[in-house]
Amino acid sequence: KTNPGLIKILANPFSLANGFQGPEQPSDAKPYDDEVVGSWVAPFIMAPINTKNVHRSNAMLNHLYGEDFQYDEMMVTGPGEQGAAVAKMVASSNPLEGDDVPKPGEGPSKESREAGHYDVLFVGTNEQGQRIEATVTGDMDPGYGSTSKMIAESALCIVHDCAGLPGGVYTPAPAMGDKLIERLVANAGLAFDLGA
């Protein structure tokens, strides 16, 4: 059965932000030609989860990114007609349906996990039109190899580097900040680059 109250919570990008309700956020449900990135973009499967955690981090950091902060996550599909076609195809398909979807307990082989990698581009703009870019890259499949290393390093960081952290439900940025980034670079195959 459908639970309208739950659907409303799941649709709210601020549902984990301790009661804060910020400005209207960009829609991550439809493909569009993103002028900031210079490419067509399509919905990203993890965006509904990740955006809530980013807004929770901002709230826990006393709105370090601003109370008017807007955030969305999309998959870059390329410029022009080809980028538009790929974006529309991605938006119309469900990666959790079909004959080739792994069954519970199945997943990529060890070789596939180790050969995987990712490159995430963050683009920020302000009201004056200034732009900043950052990238995060990982040396293994993000859903399996890299995630397990991030979880292990987060646990070690909390135990060894954040002894004074009071109890609570945190996101990584307010709980561990740069201490976690240092561990991820040193031990988990991640690289962080803050461009201009």
Predicted regions and their residues:
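C-terminal catalytic/substrate-binding lobe primarily of soluble NAD(P)-dependent oxidoreductases
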Residues: K1-A196
